[in-house]
Structures are given as C-alpha cells and as structure tokens.
A protein has these predicted regions:
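Conserved beta-strand edge residues that scaffold enzyme active sites
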Residues: 22-23, 64-65, 159
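Aromatic-lined carbohydrate-recognition surfaces of secreted/lumenal glycan-active proteins
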Residues: 55-67, 91
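Histidine-acidic metal/acid-base catalytic patches
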Residues: 6, 12-14, 44, 69-88, ...
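Short coil/turn segments at secondary-structure junctions
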Residues: 26-31, 59-62, 125, 129, ...
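Glycine-rich "substrate-gating" loop/helix at the edge of Rossmann-like oxidoreductase active sites
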Residues: 35, 65, 98
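Short beta-strand segments at enzyme active-site cores
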Residues: 13-21, 54-60, 153-156
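An active-site-proximal structural segment forming one wall of the substrate-binding cleft
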Residues: 1-15, 37-53
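Surface-exposed, active-site-proximal loop segments in enzymatic domains
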Residues: 21-35, 163-170
Length: 190
C-alpha cells in the first residue's frame, strides 16, 4: 500500500481510497473477528504512512456479504476502532443505498467521513450510473450529507458506459445533473 500512497503523494492527491475485502474474504476458515483485526492493524499502519506524506485514507463501504465493511454501522465501527487521524470514511451513496441504509443513517458518520462518491444505481447492483439515470432519490441523501458538514469533497463516480462513442456526453450529463441537485440542496452555487 505504501507504493500507492507514494503515487498519490507524487501526483498531489488528497487521499487514497481503500476497499476492504470486496471479493476475497470468505468468513469461513479465518474467523471474521480475526480478519477485522488484521484490517484494522493494516489500515492503522497505512494511516501512519499516509499522515507522514500529508495524505488521508478513505475507506469505502462495499454492499457485498463478504466485505468487511458492508453497512454504515460497520463503517462507523471500523473507522472508530482504527482511530487514526488520517483515516476516514468515503460515503459512496449508491453503495450505501444498496446496503439497505436510510439517509438518516449517515448521521452515524458525522466527523468520520471526508469524501463522497456520487453515482446512481439500478437498485440491485452498483453500476456507478450517472446521477439521475437510476433509482436513487438523491434529495434526502444530499440533505444528510450537508448536515455532516464534511471538510472533504464530493466526486462523481462513473464506470462502464454502455455507449463508448457517447462517453463525453455521458460525463457532461452526469456533471450537469449533479450540479443541479447540489444547487437545489443548497450545497453549490449554480
């Protein structure tokens, strides 16, 4: 992870996003509490290195049954247990929605979050659709994000574009819709 933090530092990034056990943890042979402990220890160590280099690590909730951090409660517990001044939560709105959380649950992350991924989904999988192209009602989520009074940033997260020849339009639409929603929520001037 140090090489990734070095790269983030070299390119002037603010943080490095870390996903814990998206696909690799079976929770069968090695008890989940042991896996959790290893993750806490590794993130603390990485947090030391990040802080030495003026960076932060933000942890992302993944809504998969085998993920170490797959609910808002586990996200808050993990960040608190790591207890490091350079380690925070990344709130990926579509992931939080897919985990079954309600907007009010974001309050559990007050003081613990420094970054937001903003994308939509079909309600079944996180396809990182442009905001407004899926099923999420973003207004209550934006109200809760505003109440967190986070020092971090909101970034639009887009992945697979089904029409590669329209990728520029896809990105522009995502930006326009996000700017509109944020302005309506009082989070951004038009």
């Amino acid at each position: 992870m140090k090489a990734h933090l070095d790269l983030a530092h070299d390119i002037g990034a603010r943080n490095l996003l870390l996903v814990l056990g998206e696909y690799i943890w079976q929770k069968e042979v090695i008890p989940p509490s042991v896996q959790w402990g290893w993750a806490v220890e590794a993130v603390r160590e990485a947090g030391d290195y990040a802080r030495e280099n003026g960076l932060e690590i933000v942890i992302e909730l993944e809504p998969f049954s085998m993920s170490i951090v797959n609910t808002v409660d586990l996200m808050a517990a993990f960040i608190r247990e790591v207890g490091h001044p350079a380690v925070f939560a990344n709130i990926d709105v579509s992931h939080v929605v897919l985990s079954g959380a309600q907007p009010s649950e974001l309050r559990k992350l007050k003081g613990l979050a420094h970054h937001v991924h903003f994308s939509d989904c079909d309600g079944k999988v996180h396809g990182d659709l442009p905001p407004g192209k899926g099923v999420i009602d973003f207004a209550p989520w934006l109200r809760e994000l505003a109440a967190l009074d986070m020092p971090g940033v909101l970034s639009i997260e887009l992945e697979f574009c089904p029409q590669p020849d329209r990728i520029v339009e896809w990105v522009r639409d995502a930006y326009r819709e996000t700017a509109r929603m944020m302005a309506e929520a009082g989070l951004r001037q038009r």
